[in-house]
């Protein structure tokens, strides 16, 4: 699990440095619309036609294991076999990224607070439920690897919600970004 957070932290660092060193030159009027959503690309090779078209249409740039798609508001992480494993969705204009404007996973909305996310993703505590009892709405794991954002990991959904606060108890915090993994 520690390796997972190191990878996610690396993504944040790469995105920061990639955008800090390059002036944001994104004309919103000329930004190509996302022809395919992140759901289409998860689990597919970057050489797959739908993924390759998305990368080309959105002027994505490869940085290590990442396809940085600033005009589309997302970054794609690929494994050693070039399979898209994670989509990092930016919900606001930040770090040179345009806000992702596609549908968010699990009925989440871009203006949801931590409290509303926990309500939407919550499961009633039931000791007989499989794969096990969960506290209502609480993430399976949480941390603040960059000491700026709180990362709430919902393993059962393959989703990590990143908030604009390092505090796990700031129920008014809004969503900064969402990672969706396959």
Task: Show which residues each predicted segment covers.
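Nucleic-acid endo/exonuclease domains
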Residues: 34
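Secretory targeting and sorting signals
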Residues: 9-16
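Bacterial signal peptide processing site
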Residues: 22-24
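C-terminal motif of bacterial Sec signal peptides marking the signal peptidase cleavage site
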Residues: 18-20
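A cross-family detector of function-defining hotspots
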Residues: 31, 40-93, 104, 108-182
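Phosphate/dinucleotide-binding and metal-coordinating scaffold of catalytic cores
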Residues: 27
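Bacterial N-terminal signal peptides that target proteins for export
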Residues: 1-9
């Amino acid at each position: 699990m520690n390796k997972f957070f190191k990878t996610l932290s690396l993504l944040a660092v790469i995105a920061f440095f990639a955008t800090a060193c390059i002036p944001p030159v994104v004309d919103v009027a000329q930004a190509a619309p996302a022809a395919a959503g992140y759901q289409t690309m998860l689990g597919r090779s970057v050489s797959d036609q739908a993924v390759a078209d998305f990368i080309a249409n959105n002027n994505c740039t490869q940085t290590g294991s990442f396809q940085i798609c600033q005009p589309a508001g997302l970054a794609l992480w690929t494994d050693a076999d070039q399979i898209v494993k994670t989509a990092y969705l930016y919900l606001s204009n930040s770090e040179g990224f345009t806000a992702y404007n596609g549908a968010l996973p699990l009925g989440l909305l871009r203006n949801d607070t931590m409290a509303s996310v926990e309500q939407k993703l919550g499961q009633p505590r039931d000791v007989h439920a499989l794969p096990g009892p969960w506290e209502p709405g609480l993430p399976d794991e949480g941390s603040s690897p960059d000491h700026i954002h709180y990362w709430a990991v919902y393993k059962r959904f393959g989703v990590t919600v990143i908030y604009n606060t390092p505090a796990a108890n700031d129920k008014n915090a809004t969503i900064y970004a969402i990672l969706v993994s396959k």
